[in-house]
Every structure is written in structure tokens, then in C-alpha cells.
From Swiss-Prot:
Keywords: Adaptive immunity, Cell membrane, Disulfide bond, Glycoprotein, Immunity, Immunoglobulin domain, Membrane, Receptor, Signal, T cell receptor. It comes from Homo sapiens (Human). V region of the variable domain of T cell receptor (TR) beta chain that participates in the antigen recognition. Alpha-beta T cell receptors are antigen specific receptors which are essential to the immune response and are present on the cell surface of T lymphocytes. Recognize peptide-major histocompatibility (MH) (pMH) complexes that are displayed by antigen presenting cells (APC), a prerequisite for efficient T cell adaptive immunity against pathogens. Coiled coil: none annotated. Alpha-beta TR is a heterodimer composed of an alpha and beta chain; disulfide-linked. The alpha-beta TR is associated with the transmembrane signaling CD3 coreceptor proteins to form the TR-CD3 (TcR or TCR). The assembly of alpha-beta TR heterodimers with CD3 occurs in the endoplasmic reticulum where a single alpha-beta TR heterodimer associates with one CD3D-CD3E heterodimer, one CD3G-CD3E heterodimer and one CD247 homodimer forming a stable octameric structure. CD3D-CD3E and CD3G-CD3E heterodimers preferentially associate with TR alpha and TR beta chains, respectively. It comes from the Eukaryota. Disulfide bonds join 42-110. It is found in: Cell membrane. Transmembrane segments: none annotated. One of its GO terms (biological process) is cell surface receptor signaling pathway. Residues 1-21 form the signal peptide. This is T cell receptor beta variable 3-1. The keyword Iron does not apply. Glycans are attached at residue 76.
Amino acid sequence: MGCRLLCCVVFCLLQAGPLDTAVSQTPKYLVTQMGNDKSIKCEQNLGHDTMYWYKQDSKKFLKIMFSYNNKELIINETVPNRFSPKSPDKAHLNLHINSLELGDSAVYFCASSQ
């Protein structure tokens, strides 16, 4: 077996905000092989207008990937186009990732605000 078969991409997904908030993301943890396509779902029932996706890499740098407000998507230009947010409605902002790479291993979390 080559090294490529043994490598996998690991995601740790955190629920955004304090425990009494109503922002959730699923799955909570995601372990998969490189090259796979995966989605992370984020939902809020707080009636907020804006939702966000953040990424924190192994160097502990936190960066905003996407924000979505009133049908307007703002994309961080440094995010590879393999990452694409989808918002079927105001309460959801799902993150789709194509062709996962080892460098995608990070903590991803969503948040919302008014």
C-alpha cells in the first residue's frame, strides 16, 4: 500500500457559540480519504440574517471563508474554489468540499449573527 492510501483528511467540527444557542452543524466529526467530496451542514434557528463559515488550521490561524447575508454571498478570495457554500434558505449555509486534500485538515465551524 502506498502512502496515499494510508493518508486521510480529518475534520473536527465544532458547534458555534455557547451551548444554549441554536446553531448546529453536522456531522460533528468527519474523517475521510483524500480525493473524496464531502459536505458539512450548518443550521440556525435564531432568525439571524447573516451566517459564516470559518476555518482554523494546524497553525491555529482562524480565517473567515464565507459570509452570507440576505442572499448576498461574500467569498474570501484566498479560499480554493473546491470549497463552495450553498444556502437553500436563510437558516442554512452548507459547505461543500470537492477533491479533499491533506491541507484541508482543520477545524471548521459555522456561526450566525443579526
